[in-house]
């Protein structure tokens, strides 16, 4: 008899958080930023939880320490990053898998266009993306881990600290 509640708990943990959160925001909207505005790629500390004490002088992005920043000025580089993200999202749609509920986003893309700032927080561990526009969560989607190598290659070319 105890197996039934255990089974229900396991199903809830495995499948309860596997769907897409909020309204999906396609990376095609990122294409608007290929030739204008700011486009910034971040590596964030996914190991420190937002509730933990923050060391003095730490720069944060949505509660997580920024480990590295790379401003992407080239339209070609922006397109390469966007296409990698689009491919990851297409992979996730073709091969849906239950995602885990970790959301420790170690990568982010910020676009700033006029008075609109949009952040895409990306966790390649649980394959989830959360989208924030002007400080409010506006959507989310899923991805595969495939874009991570492209993102990391751009970050390796950037400033080692920020």
Regions found by a protein language model. Name each.
Residues 5-14:
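Bacterial N-terminal signal peptides
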Residues 17-162:
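Function-determining sites in protein domains
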